[in-house]
């Protein structure tokens, strides 16, 4: 089973990716992890990626596609894989298709921007332990304090409203067009496309995914 997850940052993809991996025995391929692993392995592609990143440039689509192809040929991808954070643009989706990388399901997590802002901006973190709270959905027992240690909670830079809104604008400009792209692919019989209501409780989203994926 080969799956692509689409949806804005904060739409709940990460939580559900864990569930899909465990239930269906497939691995998650995150382009960030893949690039780091390739650089560490010192492979030919890894060296190319390192040179580009060391120069402060963005890794080209061609190189990422080559890395994806190399990664999915590995043994642990036998049952399938889950692509997270790729493709981000239509040229990347086209390049994947040209490289012969077929996908069984494209799942879109649909959540309105304002709810995403609410979800992310309300997060509070206990830096030392990694415990995450939410002022509305999962508040600490004492406001602003970690339940276990009583230490101060902080807001990550990535979780500040300005940053979140900027990421949403980028998502709508670059990645949202993929929704139309993959709907057309599904109409042509090349993949299956499903829209998931990401505003629901985690367990309800999970139940929807089980219905879709079987």
UniProtKB/Swiss-Prot annotation:
Domain of life: Bacteria
Protein EC: 2.7.4.3
Pathway: Purine metabolism; AMP biosynthesis via salvage pathway; AMP from ADP: step 1/1
Stretches the record annotates as NMP: 30-59
Binding site for AMP: 31, 36, 57-59, 85-88, 92, 156, 167
Alphabetical list of SUPFAM superfamilies matching this protein: P-loop containing nucleoside triphosphate hydrolases
Domain comment as written in the entry: Consists of three domains, a large central CORE domain and two small peripheral domains, NMPbind and LID, which undergo movements during catalysis. The LID domain closes over the site of phosphoryl transfer upon ATP binding. Assembling and dissambling the active center during each catalytic cycle provides an effective means to prevent ATP hydrolysis.
Its job: Catalyzes the reversible transfer of the terminal phosphate group between ATP and AMP. Plays an important role in cellular energy homeostasis and in adenine nucleotide metabolism.
Protein name: Adenylate kinase
Designated gene of the protein: adk
């Amino acid at each position: 089973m080969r799956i692509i997850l689409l949806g804005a940052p904060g739409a709940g993809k990460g939580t559900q990716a864990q569930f899909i991996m465990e239930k269906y025995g497939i691995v998650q391929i995150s382009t960030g992890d893949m690039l780091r692993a390739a650089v560490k392995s010192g492979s030919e592609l890894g060296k190319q990626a390192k040179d580009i990143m060391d120069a402060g440039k963005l890794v080209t689509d061609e190189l990422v596609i080559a890395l994806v192809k190399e990664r999915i040929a590995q043994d642990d991808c036998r049952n399938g894989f889950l692509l997270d954070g790729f493709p981000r643009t239509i040229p990347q989706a086209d390049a994947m298709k040209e490289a012969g990388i077929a996908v069984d399901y494209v799942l879109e997590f649909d959540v309105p921007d304002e709810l995403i802002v609410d979800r992310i901006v309300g997060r509070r973190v206990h830096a030392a332990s990694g415990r995450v709270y939410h002022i509305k959905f999962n508040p600490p027992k004492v406001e602003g304090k970690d339940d276990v240690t009583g230490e101060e909670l902080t807001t990550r830079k990535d979780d500040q409203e300005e940053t979140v809104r900027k990421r949403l604008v980028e998502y709508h400009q670059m990645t949202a067009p993929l929704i139309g792209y993959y709907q057309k692919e599904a109409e042509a019989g090349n993949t299956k496309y499903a829209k998931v209501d990401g505003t629901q409780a985690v367990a309800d989203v999970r139940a929807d995914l089980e219905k879709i994926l079987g």
